[in-house]
Regions:
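Subunit-assembly interface segments of extracellular/virion macromolecular structures
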Residues: 257-258
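Catalytic alpha/beta active-site cores
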Residues: 1-253
Length: 259
């Protein structure tokens, strides 16, 4: 819903008010406070590793203090607060200069919610890669993801935009140490099943290569770029989804391929 006077402008105060209320209700639901509610909050600070929430001169804290993980910026004027619920993080961005914060009593400009903690990159034919040319694009994108240098530059409405992988996010933990969280989903790559073949590579007799074997070798080779730097895997592992295995023989063959 938009107010009639601001429907065509860059920022609509009525919609902004509704978004702010929605954000505060979200915080109230998952991070309730001791004696106050999030709708009335005017500021934040960090004191001796504790997260202090302010309503003017009144101080309070989270009911569950363990949900506070860390912050970014000055302890008396933090620029970000990191909270955690069910092993998922949220980041409260505080930026008085941001256009979106002008209407918020605590200068909250954004609430970033961790989601899609894992993402599957699909190489299956008939879905993402119908022919050899499509397959090359899939492999190229997967290689860029594993190397960390994948980006896309495009024009829209006369402006040039660049999309690239988000860097890791750095904070200060509540015990004063450096805290780093991943800025990207954990990526898995889906290979095809055993029954398909691909014209991308032909064998000596002119027959097409089994596509599952081709996927296994090329996607695994691309992952070698990530094993040591651990930009994707936290443990230096490779994550491959192998679908459509019909019984123990095909499962055993998959095990043979990857070992």
């Amino acid at each position: 819903e938009q107010s009639e006077n601001n429907a065509s402008q860059r920022y609509d105060p009525l919609r902004g008010e509704m978004v702010i209320k929605y954000g505060r209700d979200f915080l109230e639901k998952y991070f309730p406070l001791e004696n106050l509610n999030w709708q009335s909050i005017t500021g934040f600070k960090i004191s001796d590793g504790s997260f202090i929430i302010l309503k003017d001169n009144i101080e309070t804290s989270l009911k569950n203090k363990h949900k506070f993980i860390g912050h970014r910026g000055d302890v008396n004027n933090p620029s970000a607060i990191i909270l955690k619920n069910n092993n998922l993080h949220i980041e409260i961005i505080i930026d008085p200069k941001a256009f979106s914060a002008q209407q918020d009593s605590a200068n909250i400009s954004d609430i970033i919610v961790e989601a899609a903690i894992s993402t599957i990159c699909d190489n299956e034919d008939s879905v993402a890669a119908v022919d050899a040319e499509d397959k090359i694009i899939c492999y190229k994108n997967w290689l860029g993801l594993m190397k960390g240098d994948l980006k896309s530059i495009f024009k829209k409405n006369g402006k040039t935009y660049e999309r690239k992988l988000n860097p890791d996010r750095s904070y200060i933990s509540k015990d004063g140490k450096k805290l780093k969280l991943h800025g990207r989903s954990l990526l898995l790559v889906r290979n095809v099943g055993h029954l398909m073949t691909s014209p991308a590579i032909t064998l000596k007799d002119g027959s097409e290569i089994p596509e599952g074997i081709m996927d296994a070798f090329i996607t695994s080779a691309a992952c070698l770029h990530d094993i040591n730097k651990k930009g994707n895997s936290r443990s230096g592992s490779i994550y491959i989804v192998k679908p459509k295995m019909h019984g123990p023989d095909e499962t055993s063959f998959t095990d043979l391929i990857f070992t």
